[in-house]
Amino acid sequence: MLDKARLRIAMQKSGRLSDDSRALLARCGIKINLNQQRLIAYAENMPIDILRVRDDDIPGLVMDGVVDLGIIGENVLEEELLKRRAQGENPSYITLRRLDFGACRLSLAAPVDFDYQGVECLNNTRIATSYPNLLKRYLDQKGITFKSCLLNGSVEVAPRAGLADSICDLVSTGATLEANGLKEVEVIYRSKACLIQRDGEMDATKQALIDRLMTRIQGVIQARESKYIMLHAPSDCLEDVIALLPGAERPTILPLAGDQNRVAMHMVSSETLFWETMEKLKALGASSILVLPIEKMME
C-alpha cells in the first residue's frame, strides 16, 4: 500500500532505462533495496517510494496523478501524449529536465535490397511499428498514406515474415537491423530519458523534496559532464592555456615551491578533454597534466 505522504516515483522495472535510472537515484544518495521481485521499493533514508512498472505505463501514471514523478524515454512519453489527444483527452504533465542517458532514435527501416529514394517510396505501403502515433504524425506531415501494422515486440522480423514492407522502430547501434537484413532510411524522432512531474497542486513538503532531488540530479549530471584538471604551466602562458579549455571556470592558481616561473593550475572543465587538447597544452609548456572524474558537484 502506497503512503500518499511519500514521494512516488515510477521507473522502468526492466529494460533499456532500468539500470541507468537505478544508478541515477543511487548517485543522488537515495538508498533503495531494489529486489528484482518487488514492484514497489521503499527508500531507506528519504520518504520516497519507487514503483517499478512497464515503461509504457509510466506516462499514464504521471498524467493521471497516480505517481508524482516518472523517469521515462521521450519516445514513450510522446507516443502516449499523441494517443490520448487522438482519443479526445487533454493530458498534462511537467517536464523537469532531460537526463543524460537513454539516447536513441526512432527510425524507418527497409530491407537492404529496397531501392529507397525518399519517404515518398513508402506511400501506400504497410509499415510495422510499436509507435503508430509518432509514425502517423511524421508521415502525415509528409503527405504519405500508409497502413500501420501494430506490433509490441520483434518489429524487425515483420518484413521477413511478410507482415509489412518496412518498419519503424527504435535504433541505438543498428546492429539488430543489420542482423535482420534491414537498413535505416529515415530518422523520425530523437529521444533521451527525461524526468517528468504530474501537473496540478503539489504538497509543499513533497515539492521541497522534489527540489532537493532536482538539485542532486543536476549535480550528478554536471559531475559526469565535467572533469577536474590539474597541471603545471609557465606563468607567461596562463591565458593561452585557459583558452584551450572552453567551458572551464577561472582556474585556481597556486605557486610552485622553488619555481617562480611556473604555477599549478586547478580547474573544473565542462568540456570533453581529447588527447589533441592535452598535446596542445603540453606544447605550451604544461606538464604533470591530470584529468580526473568528479563524483559529486554543486554550484
From Swiss-Prot:
Sorted alphabetically, the keyword list is: Amino-acid biosynthesis, ATP-binding, Cytoplasm, Glycosyltransferase, Histidine biosynthesis, Magnesium, Metal-binding, Nucleotide-binding, Transferase
The listed locations are: Cytoplasm
GO aspect biological process, one term: L-histidine biosynthetic process
Any GO CC annotation of this UniProt entry:
cytoplasm
> What are this entry's molecular-function GO terms?
ATP binding; ATP phosphoribosyltransferase activity; magnesium ion binding
UniProt cross-references to Pfam families, sorted A to Z: HisG, HisG_C
Q: Which cofactor does it need?
A: Mg(2+)
Q: Please name the pathway.
A: Amino-acid biosynthesis; L-histidine biosynthesis; L-histidine from 5-phospho-alpha-D-ribose 1-diphosphate: step 1/9
The reply to whether Glycosyltransferase figures as a keyword in the UniProt entry is yes
EC assignment: the record states 2.4.2.17
Query: By what means is the activity of this protein regulated?
Result: Feedback inhibited by histidine.
Entries under PROSITE patterns matching the protein: ATP_P_PHORIBOSYLTR
Q: Which reaction does it catalyse?
A: 1-(5-phospho-beta-D-ribosyl)-ATP + diphosphate = 5-phospho-alpha-D-ribose 1-diphosphate + ATP
The keyword Magnesium belongs to this UniProt entry's keyword annotation: yes
Q: Please, which domain of life does this record's source organism belong to?
A: Bacteria
Question: Oligomeric state and partners?
Answer: Equilibrium between an active dimeric form, an inactive hexameric form and higher aggregates. Interconversion between the various forms is largely reversible and is influenced by the natural substrates and inhibitors of the enzyme.
Q: What family name appears in the similarity comment?
A: Belongs to the ATP phosphoribosyltransferase family. Long subfamily.
The record describes the protein's role as: Catalyzes the condensation of ATP and 5-phosphoribose 1-diphosphate to form N'-(5'-phosphoribosyl)-ATP (PR-ATP). Has a crucial role in the pathway because the rate of histidine biosynthesis seems to be controlled primarily by regulation of HisG enzymatic activity.
What name is this protein filed under? ATP phosphoribosyltransferase
Classification of source organism: Bacteria, Pseudomonadati, Pseudomonadota, Gammaproteobacteria, Enterobacterales
Q: Which gene encodes it?
A: hisG
